[in-house]
């Protein structure tokens, strides 16, 4: 397959490297992995039933964008420190025009919100992408000029999954600022940061996959969580089998709020077992699911959880149509489906809850597709698959909640 060569040019601009004294650089704190012990600690300190917000953990490289008052040059940082402008880091220079626009917009909105000038505004996020092994997606080889030399843009992660895009992208998840040069950084509460992120055209940011008490969040099955990112970066029509997400980052909803005095951890990683950094023995035996017991108890308490629909479908028109589709799964439709089936499959014990739910889901999809606009029918393949999964999920939930009554009513001896 032919490789396309794209080159972007950037001038080398003198800039004093700052960060060694720590006055500008803010190291992103390592996040603890979730396990039964840490979850029990949350229960013990009364934080378990607080509101928590889970976002997809993107598999990439930590990346910070710094806007400093009085300086035209934006600075960029990896996990270990602010980089000099000529450092090659996966080819991030190709994104500089977009990154500058993002942080400039955030600075303007944040200063207006705070009604004051701010010394530093920092967007924390993840640099990711560079690999997408789909037969219909061309392999590309791009370079970018750094310090007068062409440098190859490389994949940030090379694992078989998750894969996001053949191109490089930035995924924002935090906003911090400091008012004065000698001051400390303040972190915006998640909802405040999202309010700003969503006002910046083209910015990819960490949307809530699920939120609520920890009992609800922990019921989310990270082992079967397919990454939500590809449709957001143009790969929605190119599904990959087994493209599992790395996991979730789960934050306390009040993290960053003035006066919030937590008695336990406020940020945890819920990782898919394949990404957990622990094994059963020192010889690197099979990895273990440290959240298995917690997840089982949470499912018993809150039920199985799917990602919030808004994290999957982000186009407003498509989102409204998706909600309408789920409204097609209702008791009246279930009664109509049962009337078409009759009592014989129930008398012979040939009908199971899953089979009935599948019939209900198919009926809902059929009626929805008859009346919906062509633009909705032709949404990306990955989103269509997700919506089908939601319809089946809602159908199963409705059928299971009424199964005993259904068996009673479908008996030939039943009378009102």
UniProtKB/Swiss-Prot annotation:
Subcellular localization, as worded in the UniProt entry: Mitochondrion
Uppermost EC category: ligase
UniProt EC number: 6.5.1.3
Coiled coil: none
Active-site residues per Swiss-Prot or TrEMBL entry: 57 (n6-amp-lysine intermediate)
Self-association and partners: Component of the RNA editing complex, a 1600 kDa complex composed of at least 20 proteins.
Family under the similarity heading: Belongs to the RNA ligase 2 family.
Designated name of the protein: RNA-editing ligase 2, mitochondrial
Organism: Trypanosoma brucei brucei
Gene name in the database record: REL2
């Amino acid at each position: 397959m032919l490789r396309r060569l794209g080159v972007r040019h950037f001038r080398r601009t003198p800039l004093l490297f700052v960060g060694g004294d720590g006055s500008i650089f803010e190291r992103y704190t390592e996040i603890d992995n979730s396990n039964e012990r840490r979850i029990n600690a949350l229960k013990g300190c009364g934080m378990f039933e607080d509101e928590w917000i889970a976002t997809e953990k993107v598999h990439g490289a930590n990346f910070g964008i710094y806007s400093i008052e009085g300086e035209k040059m934006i600075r960029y940082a990896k996990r270990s420190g602010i980089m000099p402008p000529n450092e090659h880091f996966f080819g991030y220079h190709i994104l500089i025009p977009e990154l500058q626009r993002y942080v400039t917009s955030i600075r303007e909105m944040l200063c207006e919100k705070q009604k004051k000038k701010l010394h530093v505004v920092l967007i924390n996020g993840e640099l990711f992408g560079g690999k997408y092994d789909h037969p219909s997606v061309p392999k590309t080889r791009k370079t970018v000029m750094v310090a007068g030399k062409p440098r190859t843009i490389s994949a940030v992660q090379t694992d078989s999954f998750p894969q996001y895009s053949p191109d490089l992208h930035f995924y924002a998840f935090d906003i911090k600022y400091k008012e004065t040069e000698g001051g400390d950084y303040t972190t915006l509460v998640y909802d405040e940061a999202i309010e700003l992120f969503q006002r910046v055209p083209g910015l990819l940011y960490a949307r809530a996959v699920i939120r609520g008490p920890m009992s609800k969040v922990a019921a989310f099955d990270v082992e079967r969580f397919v990454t939500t990112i590809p449709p957001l970066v143009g790969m929605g029509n190119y599904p990959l089998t087994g493209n599992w997400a790395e996991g979730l980052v789960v934050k306390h909803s009040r993290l960053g709020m003035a006066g919030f005095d937590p008695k336990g951890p406020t940020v945890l990683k819920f990782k898919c077992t394949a990404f957990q950094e622990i094994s059963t023995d020192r010889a690197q035996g099979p990895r273990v699911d440290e959240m298995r017991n917690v997840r089982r108890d949470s499912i018993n308490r809150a039920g199985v959880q799917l990602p919030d629909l808004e994290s999957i479908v982000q186009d407003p028109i498509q989102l409204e149509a998706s909600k309408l589709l789920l409204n097609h799964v209702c008791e009246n439709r279930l009664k109509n489906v049962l009337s078409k089936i009759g009592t014989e499959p129930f008398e012979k014990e040939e009908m199971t809850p899953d089979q009935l739910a599948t019939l209900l889901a198919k009926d809902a999809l059929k009626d929805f597709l008859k009346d919906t606009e062509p633009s909705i029918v032709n949404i990306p393949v990955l989103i269509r698959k997700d919506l089908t999964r939601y319809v089946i999920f809602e159908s199963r939930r409705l059928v299971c909640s009424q199964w005993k009554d259904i068996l009673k009513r479908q008996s030939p001896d039943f009378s009102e």
